[in-house]
């Protein structure tokens, strides 16, 4: 935490919106929630986890949609970040929802949590990323949108502009 002028510590909240990696459509009989990652998804997720690990990203909390493809992506990236798989919280409110529902989940986070990752789906992730940033218009599979807010409470998210916005995805060099 960087001190502000005058010596007051800065309180930051960092939100990572992460779209699940590429999923398989091979078995058309599978319910949508049960679709697994395909080969590209299984390659891309560790790559994105490695990129975050190189930046020393350490989440306090990982929340995932219950869909197999989202939870698998969360588990792969969590491993790269030395986050215990058993500590991933599966949240039904991250599957087949609206951007407002995601924002509601964020607003209810405990304020002691400073860095949270949400693993979910489009179109709601891109919609929320655009709403927060004003500039992100597309999140490809396995994209990571990172928002840093100068805030003490998660309830401020969506009401204040982020201090920093980063977007990374597997095909970005």
Task: Write out the residue ranges for each language-model feature.
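Short, Lys/Arg-enriched N-terminal segments with co-localized hydrophobic residues
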Residues: 1-11
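Active-site-proximal alpha-helix that buttresses catalytic centers in soluble enzyme cores
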Residues: 13-14, 18-94, 101, 136-139, ...
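Residues that scaffold the ATP/ADP-binding catalytic core of kinase and kinase-like folds
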Residues: 27, 128, 157
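Domain-level recognition of soluble alpha/beta enzyme cores
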Residues: 135-165, 170
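Short, surface-exposed amphipathic charged segments that create phosphate/polyanion-binding patches used
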Residues: 103-108
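Non-DNA-binding regulatory cores of transcription-related proteins
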Residues: 109-117, 122-143, 151
């Amino acid at each position: 935490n960087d001190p502000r002028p005058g010596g007051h510590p800065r309180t930051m909240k960092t939100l990572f919106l992460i779209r699940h990696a590429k999923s398989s459509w091979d078995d058309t009989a599978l319910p949508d929630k049960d679709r697994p990652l395909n080969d590209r998804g299984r390659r891309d997720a560790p790559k994105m986890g490695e990129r975050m690990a190189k930046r020393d990203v350490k989440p306090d909390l990982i929340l995932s949609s219950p869909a197999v493809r989202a939870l698998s992506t969360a588990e792969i990236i969590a491993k790269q970040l030395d986050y215990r798989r058993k500590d991933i919280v599966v949240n039904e409110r991250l599957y087949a929802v609206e951007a407002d529902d995601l924002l509601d989940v964020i607003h209810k986070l405990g304020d002691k949590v400073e860095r949270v990752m949400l693993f979910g789906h489009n179109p709601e992730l891109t919609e929320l990323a655009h709403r927060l940033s004003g500039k992100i218009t597309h999140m490809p599979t396995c994209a990571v949108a990172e928002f840093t807010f100068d805030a003490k409470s998660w309830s401020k998210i969506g009401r204040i502009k982020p201090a920093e916005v980063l977007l990374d995805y597997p095909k970005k060099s």
